[in-house]
Amino acid sequence: ENAKEFVLIDFFIVAEGGLWDKMHDILKRKIKEGVEVKFLYDDFGAAIRTRKYFKQILEHEGFEVRVFNPIMKYTSQLYMNFRSHQKIMVIDGKVGYTGGFNLARFGVWKDTGIRVRGDAVWGLTVVFLQMWEASGHDKEHVDYLKYKVMQDVQGDTWCQVISDGPVNNPKNPIESIYNQMIMYSDQ
């Protein structure tokens, strides 16, 4: 609700209902206030949980929308395992959220999410923009620096964002990092 410049959103599962409806109302209001909203979702995670023209409805409301790996009816090449399970939200380049949660309710469900401030937000922004570019049909390059915000955050916690999704495979940086941490551990 405090966004002034932009909101970047990337989720695997989007389901119409309480959680999405509340966020949708806030985002529509922010768009009317002039806030840029980029919304990216995985088609497999939303296809059976949203209405038929979900993307077009959002675009009509002023959202910039991209769908990762759209499911095309009657196609012989369905890439069902090539999905984006990333969950990212960046607000004005100052606050970022990520974790295991989706924009859907699944009954009693415990999950973890984190809020980050400082330079880690830029890491989430870059991951989002890489997926945004990969999900576009045009080859236009996104001006990443438009979303770079100089942070004035003090703290003693270090955080590094590492992307390991469809844009980065087959390199699997997360696996390499875990292997390296195990190799160099003292215990």
Predicted regions and their residues:
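Charged, low-complexity intrinsically disordered terminal segments
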Residues: E1-Q187
